[in-house]
């Protein structure tokens, strides 16, 4: 299993955060964790009614530098602010740094990040076994309505993550270099994470990305769900990775 940097303790994952006056549009932030030569921390923007308008994390200047070369990779666990876990289906964020990428060869075997926005408790995620040990949870898939059209399940599954579903229209699956894509995750019949997957080389281009997230027809858990995903390189050398345009489902 990957080296797990429990940079945020279980106490932090219960939702420690900083709050602003809820009578006005506001931002809640969670404690930062060390990453590379910088840090990472999550945040949620709220409207005057306390509902989410954007949710994501900031990678400070230096966070992409001097990342570990340890294989198979390093995981950074980020707490989410209280309002994020109360209003959206997301429980926490796990940043997976893959210095040599991962399978399939020739597509995702380049240095990249898996930005997992998890919908299940961390303790349950950590108990997901290797596929070869017990494939049952991986093979039990949700009803088709809970996944976007055009997504197919990848073979097998990943311990402490689950099964991964890919968008068959993604350019890297049709001979183009991998830059970024959007993955869905499932386990034991439930959608368990939404995952932007982004190449380090693409992050280094200082992108301004804003795109729609392909949506399922139905949502298992009531709450506010994002419809847009973005990456913004800022003048101070930091990056914002965000979900936005939330809709109550």
Regions found by a protein language model. Give the residues of each.
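Intrinsically disordered, flexible peripheral segments
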Residues: 35-39, 48, 52-63, 122-124, ...
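Bacterial Sec-dependent N-terminal signal peptides
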Residues: 3-34
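N-terminal export/targeting leaders of redox proteins
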Residues: 19, 23-24, 66-68, 104, ...
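A general structural signal for short secondary-structure junctions and capping/turn motifs
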Residues: 2, 44-48, 105-109, 230-234
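Phosphate/adenylate-binding glycine loop and adjacent helical scaffold
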Residues: 24-25, 38, 44
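Short N-terminal edge-element motif at the start of the domain
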Residues: 32-36, 48-111
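Histidine-centered catalytic micro-motifs
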Residues: 107-124
């Amino acid at each position: 299993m990957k080296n797990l940097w429990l940079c945020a303790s279980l106490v932090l994952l219960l939702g420690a955060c900083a709050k602003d006056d809820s009578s006005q549009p506001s931002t809640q932030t969670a404690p930062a964790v060390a990453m590379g030569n910088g840090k990472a921390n999550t945040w949620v923007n709220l409207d005057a009614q306390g509902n989410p308008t954007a949710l994501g994390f900031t990678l400070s200047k230096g966070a992409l530098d001097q990342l570990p070369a340890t294989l198979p990779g390093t995981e950074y666990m980020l707490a989410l602010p209280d309002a994020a876990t109360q209003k959206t289906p997301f429980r926490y964020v796990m940043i997976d740094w893959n210095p040599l990428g991962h399978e399939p060869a020739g597509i995702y075997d380049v240095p990249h990040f898996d930005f997992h926005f998890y919908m299940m408790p961390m303790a349950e995620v950590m108990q997901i076994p290797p596929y070869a040990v017990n494939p049952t949870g991986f093979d039990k898939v949700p009803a088709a309505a809970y996944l976007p059209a055009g997504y197919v399940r990848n073979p097998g599954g990943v311990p402490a993550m689950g099964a991964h579903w890919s968008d068959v229209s993604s350019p890297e699956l049709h001979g183009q270099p991998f830059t970024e894509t959007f993955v869905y995750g499932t386990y034991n019949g439930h959608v368990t994470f939404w995952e932007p997957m982004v190449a380090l080389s693409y992050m280094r281009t200082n992108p301004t990305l804003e795109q729609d997230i392909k949506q399922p027809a139905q949502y298992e858990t009531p709450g506010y769900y994002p419809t847009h995903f973005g990456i913004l390189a800022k003048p101070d050398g930091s990056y914002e990775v965000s979900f936005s345009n939330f809709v109550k489902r």
